[in-house]
Amino acid sequence: MAEQHTGVGRQRGARPWPRPRRVATLSVHTSPLHQPGTGDAGGMNVYILEVARRLAEADVEVEIFTRATSADVPPVVEMMPGVHVRNIISGPLGGLTKEELPGQLCAFTAGVLRAEASRAAGHYDLIHSHYWLSGQVGWLAKERWGVPLVHTAHTLAKVKNAQLAAGDRPEPKARVIGEEQVVAEADRLVANTKTEAGDLIDRYDADPTRVEVVEPGVDLARFTPAAGDRSRAQALARRRLGLPERGYVVAFVGRVQPLKAPDVLIRAAAALRQRDPALAEELTVVVCGGPSGSGLDRPTHLIELAASLGVTDSVRFLPPQTGDDLPALYRAADLVAVPSYNESFGLVALEAQACGTPVVAAAVGGLVTAVRDQVSGVLVDGHDPAVWARTLSRLLPDTGLRATLAQGARRHACNFSWDRTVSGLLEVYGEAVAAYGPQSSELATCSC
């Protein structure tokens, strides 16, 4: 079952809280306008957009501040009524990696402060920053505007550095220090899972009374099992995506980076050829996504890896999928693999399960919450390709087991929804506003 929206060690929801009228959402390094699976766009983009949409439906206006990366995008974009994206010019429009952005935080902060200064006093009731770069901006803005700061880390440097993939670079000390500062200054810290809450408290010395667990959700109307006969629907989905209609398909969906470990799945396919050549002959591995920081570039190193392992004919590479094609990919797959070295939650796992597709995931971080082991999928200890190959060889031929897991996958995913996430966030927002100062008396109250 999904965790409740609870503060660490406390029960909540027993009293009405003031509801903010307007929220300033900070997302320095990635925009909800960007396609997930490309560059630095991923689950955080989905989170920000889905939360903003539902906050607006609850009559809370949201203005999302992000760094401008294209001259073709206007300074302000209305994504929907009540949700605007403000593109702040801070440094060159292109060519900057996420690691280079700290040098542009001053320019970004200036743009945020100028935008607020053009409004009537007290325009924003609360700031919600996402990722440590945004937290640094939110820290200053909260002091200038006199409003509370709610922060969601999404990933934590100390956790990533403790679980580095081979060839991955450690997060720099400057990021660790920056995260420590934001943790100390934020009025509320939103963790995706109890595991992340524990990391904030144990690794960053966060005040437990300011740490709140609010799980992400999934769009249960968009990500659904195929209607009618599953085998026929799966074949149609594969035809739509140009995948083999016969045999087994195991899909990886996400940014192509060492942390996400798509190479583990390719190496597992090679190991399966040694373990069960007949089964391996029927397997197609799909890697869907683009390299971090480079948009839609082809993942050359994975193409070369597949060639060196002799599995080129078993691996298909797809660009990030949009619209109905992403649910179609999940439905086309027999299994979705999430072999990441760390995930604060793992929205891909939740989306796949909502489509009724079992997930094989590494037993790390938030994936332990996102996937219910032996019920909605299988959690694998470690990243040894031989172990992953053994897991695939057990699951793929066993149609009865996969059918049972498919039913459990949808049931498990139904415990999560974005409406539930926003209900929890509104409670956190209300607590933060109520604790911050007398201006909360001017706001509407809600029983979340």
From Swiss-Prot:
Family matches, as InterPro entries: Glyco_trans_1, Glyco_trans_4-like_N, Mycothiol_biosynthesis_MshA
Annotated catalysed reactions: 1D-myo-inositol 3-phosphate + UDP-N-acetyl-alpha-D-glucosamine = 1D-myo-inositol 2-acetamido-2-deoxy-alpha-D-glucopyranoside 3-phosphate + UDP + H(+)
Domain of life: Bacteria
SUPFAM superfamilies: UDP-Glycosyltransferase/glycogen phosphorylase
Keywords attached to this entry: Glycosyltransferase, Magnesium, Metal-binding, Transferase
Region (Disordered): 1-21
Binding site for Mg(2+): Y330, R331, A333, T357
Gene3D superfamilies assigned: Glycogen Phosphorylase B (3.40.50.2000)
Binding site for 1D-myo-inositol 3-phosphate: H29, D40, A41, G42, G43, M44, N45, K98, Y131, T155, R175
Function in brief: Catalyzes the transfer of a N-acetyl-glucosamine moiety to 1D-myo-inositol 3-phosphate to produce 1D-myo-inositol 2-acetamido-2-deoxy-glucopyranoside 3-phosphate in the mycothiol biosynthesis pathway.
Protein name, per record: D-inositol 3-phosphate glycosyltransferase
